[in-house]
Structure formats: structure tokens, C-alpha cells
Amino acid sequence: MITASSAILLVALIAALWRLSLIGQRPKDYPPGPPTLPILGNLHQIPKARRHIQFEKWARQYGPVYSLILGTKVMIVLNTEDAIRELVDKRGAIYASRPESFIAQDTISGGLRILWMHNGETWKMVRKLAHRILNITTARTYVPYQDLETKRMLVDFLEKPDSFIEHMRRFSTSLTTQMTFGFRTTTIHDPRFKESFDIFDESWELVASPVAALMDFFPFLRKIPDFLLPVKREAKKLHQREITLFRDHYFETRRKLQDGTAKPCVCVDLMKLQKEESFSDNLAAYIGGSLLQAGSETTAGVLVGFIQAITIFPSVAKIAQEEIDYICGDRLPDLNDVPDLPYVRACTKETLRWMPGFLLGLPHAATRDDVYLGYRIPNKATILMNVWAVHNNPEQYPNPRTFDPRRYMDHEYYPQTAANTEVTRDHFAFGAGRRRCQGIHIAERSLFLSISRLLWAFDFKRAVDPVTKLEIFPSMDDLSDGAFTQPNTFPARIVPRSEEKARRVGEEWGKVLELLDGDMQWRTVPEGLIWRDYEAVA
């Protein structure tokens, strides 16, 4: 005879088993997707590497929007420009948050990294601050930094052309440290540079690990003690290293502001805003540190992609050089030439389409239930923008893996302008919606100046195999597989276009040297930079 208590336990067990059986299943009103397995859903089908290839295949199979069931979570993948614009841009209030990221945000970042922060009050405050310190007016004031570092990069290419990837990393990092903290990074071997990128690389290894993913898909795993989860232990250690580095940079800028040696930079602006908004030193340090990591890696990666593209498609460089020679002659291009160099401008846009860096974008999250194309998108769903699929849609971009700037010759808009209009977007390399990169103004200027000056000064040719004497064709499919995707190291033969241009590069750097001290830092505030008369921050 079954007692009442036994009956209750039996019902509870049946209910628990029923709920467990639902994990991994795709509800009928969700967007379509690949077949699932109980508990796992589609977890077993997510590749460890080159995920963009599989995600593009699913896009061709399932259409503009599909869903992946990942344990207890659901991911909605957007595969067309229309889908991204409709949901992430037009319905931005719903899709401005981020999914849970226990290791990346809660553990490594102590909840302070803006990139992964939920769209709560802190994120909204920081977004407003970022607009004030990274807007188009402010972007124009940093042109002296961009001018200096592109000239230094030309000298580096002239002296050690085989190390061109290192030169672009140093350029990108130095530009970012100047704009963020007010100091130049004069060598890629700077210990501050090395520590920052060591932390970034080690963090990504943890964030991309299967264990980290499982703790997001099955949150109960987070309660496992640290001694049984090495990922958690290492993440906490990385947080201590990271916050120490970021605070050191921030407090050093504060000290320089107090003694009158600081240069205009984001952190000086932050100190003024910190007095107005009363946010913590740790948050301020993470804002600066996050800008450092993001800006340093992305610009360099895009430039590496451009060099690979013109090595594979040399006719592009020839056309661009003819345009530059006609407009600029024997002088270096500058930002005043933007309206007169439409093909070079198109090269910048095509680079961002051809090698966007974040091939699957950065994930957003829905904050309430929504409906699109008749499918339900549930609250807290992860929203993934399949940038690779959009950028390689043959209906919009015929022969998409051909690097062809002519696609953009009739695009008169800057990326920022196109992102805010009803016209076709140039690309989604800077993201979309309310999470779009707010450094877009600075990035597009850095890329134009770098690309135009490199093309003015140098020819980029395929390297020759010393044994076979045949040209080496870089593989456009040989990509790094980290947080930010770029071509893996490849050889190229980089030579000055003429002795006169090589001499001019040296002369331009000689003029810059007069502005630098013995440590190769700015002697005074560069001419043209707006210095706000901030009182020293205690």
C-alpha cells in the first residue's frame, strides 16, 4: 500500500524527471535549428575551432534566424543584415544586455568589465561617460597621436620589413596607451605591454574552455568548490593581476596630473567625470584597462588582414597607389585627404568586411520575450550576430572572398553614419545597436591614416620560397582562433616604392623626434590637442 508520503515523493520524482527530460529540447515556437540531444541540446555540435564555418553552414540551411539549444540556455543566431538591423538596432532597448558569463565577467573581471556588463544602471552610466570621452569631437583631438605613430610605423617598416606584424602591434598599442593613459609604448617588449597581453591571452584560454562554457549552460556547476575547479582558481588569480595592472596605470596618470606632467587622455577625462559621478577607482581603472586591451588588439589585427589582402590581390594596392599619387604627390597622406581618396576609403571598409575580427560578433542578450518572423525569442536568450555569414553573403557581396574595394565606391558614409541610417550598412565589424563600439570614430581614422600612408610609402609583394623560388601565396583561411580573429603569421616582401619616398619617411620622423624627450615620450602637450584645464585630482 502506497502511503501519502510515498505518493508525494513519487510525484516529485516524476515531475523532476519530466523537467529534466525537457532540458536540451527545442520548443516548437523557437526558430529552427539542428536536431538536439537530451540534456546537451546542440552542445555536442559546436566546434572547438573555426566555429564561424559551421555557423555559416547552419545559416545556409536554416535561413535568416536559427536557434541552438545549449543545455539550459538558448542561443538565437542572426544571419542577415535585415535581422540584425530589425532586432539589435531598431529594437535596441530589448537587446542591449549581455548573457551571463561567470568566468569572463564575474570571476576574471570582478563584475567590472564594461564589455560583459548587463545593461543595468552602472552600464548605462558608463555608456554615457564613454560617449562624452570617445565622441567624434574628442576623436579629432587625438589626431597628433595618430600622426606620430603612423610615421613611427613607416620607419619600422623601412628598418625591419620582415617584422611587419610586430610593428603593427606596437603601433596599435602605443596609439591606445597614449589615448587612454597618455604615454607611448616605444617597443613591443615593454613589460607593461607584455603583462597586459599575457593576461588577455590567458584569460581567453579560460573563457573559451569547455568548463567555463558548462558553468554558463548549467549554472549549478558554479557551486563546486574551487579546489575541484582549477578554472575558477586560475580566474581569480588573473583578476588580481589584471586589477593591479589597471589600477597602476590609472593611479600613475593621476600622479602625473597632480605634478603637471600628464598628457591629454581618456583617463584624465575619467578623473574629472569621477568627481561628478562618484564611481569607484576600480571601475575607472577597468574602463581604462578595457579600452587598452580592446584598442590594442583590434586595430593591429585589421591591418594584418589588409596586408594579407593586398598580398593576395596586388591589383588593389596598385589602384590605390595611383589614386594616392595623383592626390598627394610626394607628401604623406593625411586626414584632410579623406574626401579625395574614395578608393582608399573603400579599402578600409572592404578590409573590415573581409576580415572583421569578431567573426561571430559579441553576444547580446534579450531582456524580455519577443517575436521575429513568427518565432518566439525568449527572455535571457543569447543573441549572436553571425557577422561572418552576413559579410560573406553572395547575394549582397558577389564573390565574397575576393577583396574588392569597388563594392564601396558608391558609399559616401562613414561607418558611424551608415550605422545610424536606413541605408545598407557597410559592415558589422564594430557591432550593432546600443553595444556598438563607441571608439568607431577613432578606429576609422587610425585605419585610414595607416592604410593610406603604408600604400604611399611601400610596395607589398608575395615572399619567395628560398628553395623552390616560387611565390608564397598566403592562405586567407589560415586564421587565429582566439577572442579576436586575424590571419596567422605569413611572409611578405615589403619594399620602399622609391628612394625618394624612403628618404621622406626618415625626414618626417626626424621632425617628430624634435617633439620627443630622451625616453621617446612627448615633451609637451602636442599642438592641436585640446587640454582641458582640470584641477589635480586628490
From Swiss-Prot:
One of its GO terms (cellular component) is membrane. The chain crosses the membrane at residues 4-24. The keyword Phosphoprotein does not apply. Heme binds at residue 437. It is a single-pass membrane protein. GO terms for molecular function: heme binding; iron ion binding; monooxygenase activity; oxidoreductase activity, acting on paired donors, with incorporation or reduction of molecular oxygen. The keyword Oxidoreductase applies. Disruption phenotype: Leads to the accumulation of the 2-alkyl salicyl alcohols. It is found in: Membrane. Keywords: Heme, Iron, Membrane, Metal-binding, Monooxygenase, Oxidoreductase, Transmembrane, Transmembrane helix. Its EC number is 1.-.-.-. Pathway: Secondary metabolite biosynthesis. Its cofactor is heme. Belongs to the cytochrome P450 family. The PKS fogA releases the carboxylic acid (8E,10E,12E)-3,5,7-trihydroxytetradeca-8,10,12-trienoic acid as its product, as well as derivatives with one and two double bonds. This is Cytochrome P450 monooxygenase fogE. It comes from Aspergillus ruber (strain CBS 135680). The lineage of its organism: Eukaryota, Fungi, Dikarya, Ascomycota, Pezizomycotina. The gene is fogE.
